[in-house]
């Protein structure tokens, strides 16, 4: 049901300029005079993204890309957190079924340099969702040159080079992992130890609560412009999975305060979900016995 919405375009320029994290970069780099190499490469990549099946869109995980209707180098992206209940063999993740918004700007030297990417889902700068996802939105990823490891590869005669899609998939698969605590440099050696695993559970506990607040409740309250239909459809279709996941998270909460916080968030979330069901003509489910 979500497939036709995977790639789309919308107007991102408002009366006061672009409503985008990289609005200054956009203003400083007008389309007039944009290098042909950048435009040619972007045209190729966006054409591929628009092809059915190019972007991963499933209940387990999804990536939705929105380009500006006037500028192909201005993008917004929603990445859904990998769903715990649907991929048990890969382990639990604390991001399950949440929607995380990223802003992307493609600089003039592209594809010789990587795109610029910033996370917008941060609870207004209060939440660091991962050692690689800062509360100011910085994304630490080797492809972006902001983390150790193999960096961005410009295209050559024998290699097509790195792509925007690779960046987005890497965020979902390399950063949004079951145990993000161990992404922190120096903490990896603790993995498998009783103390390290306990710290990881406590870390995930806080992230689960933050995911419910900001990537589910707040996303439903204020869906990003252009993504409204995707957000509504995502949470309406996946409500049963979301509520089963929430019940499990509440049962596994490491502290009473976290458990109570999740229950409060669900109390605020339920009317929003009921409203989606009512608008779609669905039967509103009975209250989930979380506690």
Protein language model regions, located:
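UBC/E2-like fold recognition across ubiquitin and ubiquitin-like conjugation systems
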Residues: 1-97, 109-291
